[in-house]
């Protein structure tokens, strides 16, 4: 990358601005990074404009080159980040995280559009960890194609861990083919775990819509809760649909739930 980084005494790359955040993928998605201060990413609203509108920030890590390192936010916040990639998969500040770790970071007032595996912080975790982190803002997916796995914090948790984290997002997934939307996690699957986490999100979707998790499949939710408003088919205050021995322990929901069937 053409962006320079300093390293701290532990050899971690220091991220001090939004350009350094954007260039993590080019600098090395297998490296370790630390956020040294809050970042206002308002400028991303004008990034990557091809004449038909700005696509904004390019998610860190994708399916072919996922983020595999560690990112420690040190309790700092990234605010006003903008992503408009309505045909894309693996969309979030981090698009795809494989066996990597994202911790101690807040994403405030994010604005994201995408199609599949979309989250306020991470699009998809594959065996990795998101801990002590949160996201707030707007995730709005509208497509005539099939869109799935959309969450306020994490789109899909595939065998990974989400712990001590929360989301307060407006998550809207419209379109007749759209499924799996959750206030915190869209789909929790393959022994994924969600622990000590909560969502106060407003969640709207077509099918398999949950205040915390849209679909909990062969996975676990522990000591977590949701208080948001949920609207959709297969709608649940905590979980939209449970399958294949998925478990929920010491968790609850108190939000308003409106179930509706496609076509209503």
Task: Place the predicted regions along the sequence by residue.
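Surface-exposed repetitive/solenoidal architectures
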Residues: 1-264
């Amino acid at each position: 990358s053409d962006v320079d980084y300093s390293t701290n005494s532990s050899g971690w790359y220091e991220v001090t601005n939004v350009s350094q955040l954007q260039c993590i993928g080019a600098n090395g998605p297998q490296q370790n990074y630390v956020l040294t201060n809050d970042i206002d990413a308002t400028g991303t609203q004008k990034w990557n404009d091809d004449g038909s509108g700005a696509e904004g920030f390019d998610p860190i890590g994708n399916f072919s080159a996922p983020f595999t390192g560690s990112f420690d936010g040190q309790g700092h916040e990234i605010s006003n980040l903008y992503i408009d990639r309505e045909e894309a998969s693996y969309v979030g500040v981090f698009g795809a995280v494989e066996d990597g770790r994202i911790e101690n970071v807040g994403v405030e007032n994010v604005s994201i559009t995408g199609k599949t595996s979309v989250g306020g912080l991470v699009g998809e975790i594959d065996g990795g960890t998101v801990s002590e982190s949160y996201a707030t803002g707007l995730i709005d997916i509208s497509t005539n194609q099939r869109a799935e796995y959309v969450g306020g914090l994490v789109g899909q948790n595939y065998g990974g861990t989400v712990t001590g984290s929360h989301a307060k997002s407006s998550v809207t997934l419209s379109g007749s083919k759209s499924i799996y939307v959750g206030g915190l996690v869209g789909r929790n699957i393959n022994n994924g775990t969600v622990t000590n986490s909560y969502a106060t999100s407003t969640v709207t979707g077509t099918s398999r819509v949950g205040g915390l998790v849209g679909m909990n499949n062969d996975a676990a939710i522990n000591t977590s809760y949701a208080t948001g408003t949920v609207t959709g088919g297969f709608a649940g205050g905590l979980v939209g649909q449970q399958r294949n021995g998925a478990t929920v322990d010491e968790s609850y929901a108190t939000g308003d739930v409106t179930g509706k069937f496609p076509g209503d």
